[in-house]
Amino acid sequence: MAGFERIVDERSTSGPDRSEAMVAYTKLNLSRSRRWLKQLNMLPELENGLPLVAPQNWLVLTEYWCGDAAQCCPVMAELARRTPGLTLRFVFRDEHLALMDHYLTEGGRGIPKLIAVDAATGTERFTWGPRPVAAQALVDTFRAVPVEQRDVEAMKEALHTWYFYDGCASVQQELLALCS
């Protein structure tokens, strides 16, 4: 969080687009991330972390300005904190495009993208992202509308409202299923 807070204090963001809009998204996302870290309700079956078969390393491609990351990455951080044998590292997508291009979602560089590997062998165990299945369905419905008819602001509001009411339960359930 220290890097996130510092970049907000500097009125900047990650990635090549340092426009005022991206800086504003970054500030908003710090607030969202802090809120989830403060009031995240873990599923009862995750109180003691994930049931890993073997130690894992999780690498998450992300950016500070990404709204989905602000909703999902705090869950990953909390799971890593609670799970013995799980290490977590966040890296910026736009600094690792060659890696990102191996993990495209429907041809796009959707983030956050979690890549889980076996800590002993380096074998990929699974990937997840950029958002829970139900949230992806909302995005897919939006993308089905002709570009000239899309209401981007309404879509963002609907997506973040969905995240609020979901309470990060879907992220937890999906990651639990992948680790079980």
Task: List the predicted regions and their residue ranges.
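Non-globular targeting/processing and membrane-anchoring segments
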Residues: M1-Q56, E78, R82-G85, D101-R109, ...
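Conserved redox-active cysteine motifs that mediate thiol-disulfide chemistry
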Residues: Y64-Q71
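Thiol-based oxidoreductase modules, predominantly thioredoxin-like and allied folds used
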Residues: W58-Y64, M76, P84-M100, V117
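A short secondary-structure junction signal
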Residues: Q71-C72, F126
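Short, well-ordered alpha-helical packing segments
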Residues: C73, A77-A80, I111-I115
